[in-house]
Amino acid sequence: LYGDRGTGKSTSIKAVANRFWPDGLRVIQVYRHQMKMLSRIISAIRTRNYRFIIYMDDLSFEDFETEYKYLKAVIEGGLESKAENILIYATSNRRHLIKETWDDRNDMEHTQDMHRSDTMEEKLSLVNRFGVTISYTKPTPKEFMEIVITLARKQGIAMSDEDLKKEANKWELSHGGLSGRTAQQFINYLLGKE
């Protein structure tokens, strides 16, 4: 799941976990510094009577970091068969997970990398192994206002739609722009004023 900040990527994972918890779904959050342990984690849970999501939040790598290679090997590499009860989910603000530079794409310039296309393939190979990519985009101004009004009504805030829109517009300009997170923070602010 990738896209703009505050658009609900992590919230979607939590919603899936809550929805399917009664059916035996469990979530294990793995942090970047724990990538080396992925094989051990999978070995420990692959025969359990639950279904698992191994979840990595806000995953991205700088071009000099190599931890992503452990993740690549686990997703579709190695000799061990894929576990039927385990899925790997990641959220990121970066579409390709690994930082790209203009040098990566410019085949005309001379750099230290003799085979630049190999470098690009290496960087893209991680995201391609996930199989499914879901994009989260910022809401339009109209959608943002609909989110604000819906949240306000759920919380019993008695402001008129017109006043809500006016105040929400001021709020988003100084608090991170159009996103579901910004809408929720605005509602929390209004609730705190009551």
State what each model feature region is.
Residues 137-194:
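C-terminal alpha-helical "lid" subdomain
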Residues 1, 16, 71, 91, ...:
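Conserved RecA-like P-loop NTPase ATPase core
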Residues 63-112:
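Conserved catalytic/switch belt of AAA+ P-loop NTPases
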Residues 1-28, 41-47:
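Walker A/P-loop
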